[in-house]
């Protein structure tokens, strides 16, 4: 039976957990290699989702002549909150 494809958030959460385990440094070599391989797979899943999102954004921001209108995005709401906290 084929494994269900993870959504972006699931893959990212698992990737973060794998990285945390690997950074701990207490794993036997074989387990570390297995987790590293899993992490590579998870990073590829995340990358596919991000590339797909980038393509969708390019389509949505295309002008009437088919050219892409590049718009600079401001900081995310979370980034703005972090900036305000430093003041």
Curated annotation (Swiss-Prot):
InterPro entries linked to this entry: Exonuc_VII_S, Exonuc_VII_ssu_sf
GO biological process, one term: DNA catabolic process
One GO location term (cellular component): cytosol
Assembly information from the UniProt record: Heterooligomer composed of large and small subunits.
Family stated for the protein in its record: Belongs to the XseB family.
NCBIfam families to which the protein is assigned, alphabetical: xseB
UniProt name for this protein: Exodeoxyribonuclease 7 small subunit
């Amino acid at each position: 039976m084929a494994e269900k494809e993870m959504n972006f958030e699931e893959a990212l959460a698992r990737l973060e957990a794998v990285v945390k385990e690997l950074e701990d440094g207490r794993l036997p070599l074989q387990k570390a290699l297995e987790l590293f391989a899993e992490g590579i797979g998870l990073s590829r899943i995340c990358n596919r989702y991000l590339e797909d999102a980038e393509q969708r954004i390019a389509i949505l921001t295309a002008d009437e002549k088919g050219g892409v209108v590049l718009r600079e995005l401001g900081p995310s709401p979370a980034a703005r909150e972090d900036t305000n906290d430093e003041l």
